Amino acid sequence: MTMCSGARLALLVYGIIMHNSVSCSPAAGLSFPGIRPEEEAYDQDGNPLQDFYDWDPPGAGSPASALRDAYALYYPADRRDVAHEILNEAYRKVLDQLSARKYLQSMVARGMGENLAAAAVDDRAPLTKRHSDGIFTDSYSRYRKQMAVKKYLAAVLGKRYKQRVKNKGRRIAYL
């Protein structure tokens, strides 16, 4: 509704400007490049007079320029700068909140929601690096557990485990 009324206001202002420029201009606000006077007109000193067919009246412009002029008339530059600054601050706050919310959701999804203080210290590392580090840590801890189980089995089974390794030529996993 507000955009519609704003567009109507801009159209009204543009219509008023165009109406005034058409009724007040010597060439009726229109340029006819194909129509030229037969002879040129000169003033008292012999200088040629201005050609009204090549002259653009100051009020006739594109609708965008009329809208800019109306905007500049009602909203001075100093007020616009303050408004833009306030808008930029609010936009930045909203983006910060969205990024923080997205970060917290990713932390909860990964199951690290209980360790937020430690994660906040390491904010500089990208999430992909953290993810790959987590995969490596999980794989390495799994490997260490497997080696511990093999070592335990070797100690319990003793000689029998070593014989099987020699006979087969490779290690036998008891997992």
Swiss-Prot record:
SMART domains: GLUCA (SM00070). Transmembrane segments: none annotated. It comes from the Eukaryota. GO terms for biological process: adenylate cyclase-activating G protein-coupled receptor signaling pathway; adenylate cyclase-modulating G protein-coupled receptor signaling pathway; behavioral fear response; cellular response to glucocorticoid stimulus; histamine secretion; insulin secretion; negative regulation of acute inflammatory response to antigenic stimulus; negative regulation of acute inflammatory response to non-antigenic stimulus. The keyword Coiled coil does not apply. InterPro entries: Glucagon_GIP_secretin_VIP, VIP/GHRH-like. Residues 1-24 form the signal peptide. Residues 149-157 are annotated as: Important for receptor binding. It is found in: Secreted. GO terms for molecular function: neuropeptide hormone activity; peptide hormone receptor binding; pituitary adenylate cyclase activating polypeptide activity; pituitary adenylate cyclase-activating polypeptide receptor binding; signaling receptor binding; type 1 vasoactive intestinal polypeptide receptor binding; type 2 vasoactive intestinal polypeptide receptor binding. The keyword DNA repair does not apply. The modification Lysine amide is found at residue 168. Residues 25-78, 172-175 form a propeptide. Keywords: Amidation, Cleavage on pair of basic residues, Hormone, Neurogenesis, Secreted, Signal. It holds the Pfam family Hormone_2. The modification Leucine amide is found at residue 157. One of its GO terms (cellular component) is cytosol. PACAP is a neuropeptide involved in diverse array of physiological processes through activating the PACAP subfamily of class B1 G protein-coupled receptors: VIP receptor 1 (VIPR1), VIP receptor 2 (VIPR2), and PACAP type I receptor (ADCYAP1R1). Exerts neuroprotective and general cytoprotective effects due to anti-apoptotic, anti-inflammatory, and antioxidant actions. Promotes neuron projection development through the RAPGEF2/Rap1/B-Raf/ERK pathway. In chromaffin cells, induces long-lasting increase of intracellular calcium concentrations and neuroendocrine secretion. Belongs to the glucagon family. This is Pituitary adenylate cyclase-activating polypeptide. It comes from Rattus norvegicus. The lineage of its organism: Eukaryota, Metazoa, Chordata, Craniata, Vertebrata. The gene is Adcyap1.
